[in-house]
Amino acid sequence: TAIVRDALIQRFEFTFEAAWKAAYRWLRARGNDVDEEAAAVIPEAFARRLIADEKGWGDMRRFRNKTSHTYDEALAMQVAAFVRQDAVRLFEALLVTLRERSA
């Protein structure tokens, strides 16, 4: 339903924010002077092998930017499909890597 889809998108938005900020804190804790913005953190996280799919994370950032500024039914359907097909996997991979490399 539309309500479930909208809830999925909202959870995606705040999960994306939490994820890139966790990557930012991990990078900073290890002496990296990266700017506190997703556009800077994503490539640096990729360079440091914190994430493996830079394109997927870039897609997430673009979707997050689009969903926060406007509502569009076609975009909502596209984002919901992306979350199901890709975003969950990307978030889980980051979580595993953070746990492994922070132990």
Question: Predicted segments — roles?
Answer:
Residues 1-103:
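Solvent-exposed interaction patches of small proteins and small membrane subunits
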